[in-house]
């Protein structure tokens, strides 16, 4: 009889613990986050480079739909030289929104759109100048949150169309801390 009671208590405890895991998954992609970002950067008519920076945002989860706002500050090594004329990509600011669907308990597929401002630095000999370019960024990605952890990783492709016909293609990886 004692074994039956202990087995029943153990089974009840296991069933009671199950909703706790489901609740953790239900809270995935809800709240604030900060992230480190790195990836590939290509600017039209220029050499490829590496981008790196930080981002922050806040997500609102409604059932399996996620709405979010986010911002980023990035730097890039992309640039090109022709003789003594060099054009280098500088910093890149972004602010925008994203909408996504939770397709598995800790997997989010999303699209994003927003405003981007990039600084391009031009050097000819000893003379330096810069220009700020405004543009629209659109992208898509997937984010995976680790089980029972505030960490998530994301992979993303984004395209930005700046004024003066300048285009940018980026492939990024991010490591986010969610709170």
Where are the predicted features?
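Gram-negative outer-membrane beta-barrel domains
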Residues: 2-5, 19-179
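Cleavable N-terminal signal peptides
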Residues: 8-10, 14, 20
